[in-house]
């Protein structure tokens, strides 16, 4: 089964696909030297020499990538209280993640893949890292692909959403479009069920007497039918990205509390 980390590694040309072809500008990606500089993957896997000091890794990265934003790197190292003279194997999981993300933000690649860039980070460090991702984008707009399970925290960072479930892409759309088509419809069960007839229900739950259906209307409609009368006891609202992600990947399940 193809997971997100495996997919990113294939796209970054770090591993080969068992079937199919990845193309870069209509040319197979495998073996293309220019793609190695155009795409950069930061992942949980540590590809750096564990005995190297951070400053050595940054210097080698600059040679390999052709450039490196040392000014931004120095600023981030100071803010995260990382000593460039440390060896990478002396860092904790969280600080190793931070350093690898620093390197990713400072290379000149047009496509930067960040696979779980907040692994092992506390809340304060996560907020600081998000700020630097935005700063790196504002300084030089390019494509950042963030792979994470903590969706709620990155919702304000992203413009486009791709949701992968059981090796299938189930959502590939702009964030605004996804949110515009995501609904929560709540009220007494009989009223909710009556209103939601023939609508694309993802999941349902019941807490006491409150019954809720979750819908993603982009499957069948551009919006909820305008001619359908909303019962007085039924409330309809949009839901956030975290909620719709959960409901999309657990669709068909009914929960009772």
Language model features by range: what are they?
Residues 112-116, 121:
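Catalytic Walker B motif of ABC-type/P-loop ATPase nucleotide-binding domains
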Residues 12:
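Helix-to-loop junction immediately C-terminal to a conserved catalytic motif
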Residues 41-100:
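ABC-family P-loop ATPase nucleotide-binding domains
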Residues 172-173:
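ABC ATPase "signature
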Residues 203, 207-257:
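C-terminal coupling/interaction segments
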Residues 123-125:
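Helix N-cap at the start of a conserved alpha-helix in ABC-type nucleotide-binding domains
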């Amino acid at each position: 089964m193809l997971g997100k980390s495996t997919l990113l590694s294939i796209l970054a040309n770090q591993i080969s696909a068992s079937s199919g072809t990845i193309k870069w500008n209509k040319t197979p990606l495998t073996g293309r030297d220019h793609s190695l500089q155009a795409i950069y993957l930061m992942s949980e896997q540590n590809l750096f020499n564990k005995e190297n000091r951070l400053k050595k890794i940054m210097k080698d990265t600059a040679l390999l990538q052709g450039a490196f934003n040392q000014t931004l790197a120095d600023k981030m190292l100071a803010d995260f209280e990382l000593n460039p003279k440390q060896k990478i194997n002396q860092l904790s999981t969280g600080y190793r993640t931070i350093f690898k993300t620093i390197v990713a933000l400072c290379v000149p690649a047009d496509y930067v893949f960040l696979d779980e860039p907040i692994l092992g980070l506390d809340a304060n460090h996560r907020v600081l890292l998000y700020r630097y991702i935005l700063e790196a984008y504002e300084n030089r707009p390019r494509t950042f692909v963030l792979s994470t399970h903590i969706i709620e925290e990155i919702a304000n960072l992203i413009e486009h959403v791709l949701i992968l479930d059981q090796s299938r892409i189930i959502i590939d759309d702009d964030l605004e479009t996804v949110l515009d088509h995501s609904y929560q419809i709540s009220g007494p069960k009989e009223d909710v069920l009556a209103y939601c007839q023939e609508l694309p229900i993802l999941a349902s739950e019941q807490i006491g007497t409150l019954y809720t259906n979750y819908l993603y209307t982009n499957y069948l409609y551009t919006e909820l039918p305008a001619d359908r009368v909303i019962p007085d006891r039924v409330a309809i609202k949009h839901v956030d990205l975290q909620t719709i992600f959960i409901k999309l990947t657990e669709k068909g399940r009914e929960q009772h509390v």
